[in-house]
C-alpha cells in the first residue's frame, strides 16, 4: 500500500520525467506484478517519460519500450540498447509467456551475463 501511495503522490506533481529507482524491489512477486500493471495503466493515460532503474531483466522487458544495459562498475557505461517491440497494452504476467519476450530476454541476457559475473567477482573481493 505504501508503494501505491508514493506512486500516487509522485504522479500528482505531474512531472515531465518520472525517475523510478528499483521501486518494486521490496514487494512479493504477486504485488509487484499488480503494481507493474498499475504503472503501465497510469503511463498509458498520459505517456510521460519514465526512467525505470532495475536489476530485474524480466521487469525491464515487461515494462519498457527500450532497455539500456550498463556495464559493471565502478566506471559504469552503456554497453547495449534494445528496442522492446512488444504489443501494448501489456499484462506483465502474460507478456512474459510470449515467444518474442523469451527471445528478447535471451538476447539481452547473452549481452549482460559477462557483466553480471564481473559485478559478482567485484562484490566478493570487497
Regions found by a protein language model. Name each.
Residues 7:
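Hydrophobic anchor residue at the start of the ABC signature
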Residues 1-4:
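Conserved ABC ATPase nucleotide-binding domain "signature" region
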Residues 47-53:
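Conserved H-loop
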Residues 18-21:
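Catalytic Walker B motif of ABC-type/P-loop ATPase nucleotide-binding domains
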Amino acid at each position: 500500500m505504501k508503494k501505491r501511495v508514493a506512486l500516487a503522490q509522485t504522479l500528482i506533481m505531474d512531472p515531465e520525467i518520472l525517475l523510478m529507482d528499483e521501486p518494486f524491489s521490496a514487494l512479493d512477486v504477486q504485488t509487484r506484478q499488480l503494481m507493474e500493471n498499475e504503472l503501465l495503466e497510469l503511463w498509458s493515460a498520459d505517456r510521460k517519460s519514465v526512467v525505470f532503474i532495475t536489476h530485474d531483466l524480466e521487469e525491464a522487458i515487461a515494462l519498457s519500450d527500450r532497455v539500456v544495459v550498463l556495464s559493471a562498475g565502478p566506471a559504469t557505461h552503456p554497453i547495449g540498447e534494445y528496442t522492446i517491440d512488444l504489443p501494448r497494452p501489456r499484462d506483465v504476467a502474460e507478456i512474459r509467456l510470449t515467444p518474442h519476450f523469451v527471445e528478447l530476454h535471451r538476447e539481452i541476457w547473452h549481452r549482460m551475463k559477462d557483466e553480471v559475473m564481473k559485478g559478482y567477482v567485484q562484490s566478493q573481493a570487497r
